[in-house]
Amino acid sequence: MDLQGQTVVLIGGSAGIGLETARRAHAQGADVILTGRSAERLAAASEDVGAASTVAFDANDTHALRRFFEDLPDPVDHVLVTAGGPSYRPMLEMTADDIREALSSHAVLGLEVARSARPKMRPGGSLVLMGGTGGRRIDHRLGIVSAATAALPPFTAALALELAPIRVNLIAAGFVDTPLSAALLGDQLDDRRDELRRTLPIGRVVSPADVAALAVHLMVNGALTGATYDIDGGQQFI
């Protein structure tokens, strides 16, 4: 099974997991459409992977997201949502607006993508959401993100029933060595990498390419829906 002749939309496709998924999907014959906030970064990503098109907008802007899908000229087979990310802040240091934004970038974004993409998606196509294992591994700096990611498995299962025959699956990732991780950790990045190499059962850090391989697998296997797939190198067991 491959993606020959299919259209894959990457919501958050200019770097990291989204970009790697675009590269892998294009290699399997898909037409890829990249979205992100920065037109400059999208242009570089498009040249890298040979994207069919790019569109710059903020995916958390519901109206812009809806217009994006409405303006697509052709049907879509698969959508991967990687926009959004963790916020390393204790809950008591966050304002109510900070908390709303963090929750929105996880649960609400996935729902709005599903709502906007549904009219353009082919039956049997798939929506792949990104979450994490934080709901099972509590960190005092990730309380809100942990709460949001813990809600995503039942959210995904219910959405799969509502969207059927469009399939919906969730990738629950641990630490992934992405540009976003580098930006969030700053000077602590190398120490974090070294720690994971020493402690993870796989003996190395999970890469964007690892997650991209899983994302494409969820797209091409038509029997998979409503499920959550962990990819953390065994991090949750240590």
Q: What label would you give each PLM region?
A:
Residues P90-M91, D98-L103, R192, L196:
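Substrate-binding pocket helix/loop in short-chain dehydrogenase/reductase
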Residues P153, E162-D177, L224-I231:
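Conserved Rossmann-fold SDR core element
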Residues V176-T199:
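A glycine/serine/threonine-rich, flexible loop-to-helix segment
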